[in-house]
Regions:
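Non-catalytic pre-domain segments flanking phosphatase-related domains
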Residues: 1-16, 222-227, 252-258
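Acidic, Mg2+-coordinating catalytic module of metal-dependent nucleases/exonucleases
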Residues: 99-111, 115-116, 144-203
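Conserved non-catalytic scaffold segment of RNase H-like nuclease domains
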Residues: 1-113, 124-125
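Short alpha-helical "recognition helix" segments of helix-turn-helix
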Residues: 205-207
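Short helix-start
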Residues: 227-258
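Short alpha-helix plus adjacent loop in nuclease-associated cores
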Residues: 130-146
């Protein structure tokens, strides 16, 4: 999306009820792992938190020691919890309401879909009703060294006692969304577009805006003297959104001029 499209989308979302979800799992891949804890929080900027509920779930598979160390959730804890089929039916109406929101939504959404597939229930939400606070934080907070939820909790001094438990993480995600969406509501278009322009994009994301392959985009950005920053051990290039969109607009103008000349 271009900055103007993002501005329209986030202004719309800021007036919606958010259904914030977090899951803790036995692993990283939905196809081979199960959810062991879920929390859902519903809230809006207008009226604050409406509802929150949390459940441990017995996955009927082992909880790896590394997951227990990471989350604090042990095999003994989930052994006493209800089975998945007794939990997910209750959560389905909640998860179908409002704008589905999570920090790294693709992770949680993938697990939600997988768990409902185990019950032969389809679960999908349109893109217009999804909000990922990682993506929003990258857009609004481009200069922070990390957009991980624990680091953002620390940066903003949110009153969250623990991380990597579903209830605490949904609250942290809500506080982050509330903060950033309030800024989107209150700041002018010009101020927000200037902020958006400072976002650092991967080559893949820059290529998507330009409508090119990554190889074509790299060459086009180099020809336009757009200088990337190089990050990480592998010196991966990143480009500022403002530079990429300026090149996009220049290409659009050039294409329109070519069409006029053809006539």
């Amino acid at each position: 999306m271009l900055s103007t499209d993002l501005l329209f989308f986030y202004r719309q979302v800021s007036h919606q009820v958010l259904t914030v979800v977090d899951v803790e799992t036995t692993g990283h891949q939905p196809d081979s792992s199960r959810v062991i804890e879920i929390s859902v929080l519903q809230a809006s900027l207008e009226s604050g938190i409406h509802h929150q509920q949390t459940h441990l779930i017995n996955p009927q598979v082992p909880v790896p020691p590394s997951i227990t160390q990471f989350t604090g959730i042990s095999q003994e804890m989930v052994a006493q919890a209800p089975l998945a089929e007794d939990v997910w039916q209750d959560y389905l109406p909640l998860l179908n309401m409002g704008t589905l929101t999570a920090h790294n939504l693709s992770f949680d959404y993938g697990f939600l879909q997988s768990e409902f597939r185990h019950l032969d229930i389809g679960f999908t939400r349109p893109n217009s009703e999804q909000l990922c606070t990682v993506i929003l934080a990258r857009l609004m907070l481009p200069d922070l060294p990390s957009r991980s939820l624990p680091n953002l909790v620390q940066h903003f001094d949110f009153p969250i006692a623990t991380s990597h438990r579903a209830e605490a993480d949904t609250l942290a995600c809500w506080l982050l969304a509330k903060l950033l969406l309030t800024e989107i509501q209150n700041e002018s278009d010009e101020t927000l577009l200037d902020r958006f322009a400072k976002q650092w994009l991967s080559l893949r994301d820059a290529a998507a805006i330009l409508g090119m392959s990554t190889q074509q985009a790299r060459a086009a950005l180099k020809r336009s003297h757009v200088k990337p920053r190089l990050v990480g051990q592998y010196r991966t290039p990143q480009y500022q959104r403002g530079d990429v969109e300026q090149l996009f607009r220049a290409n659009q103008s050039s294409n329109q001029l070519s069409l006029l000349q053809d006539f």
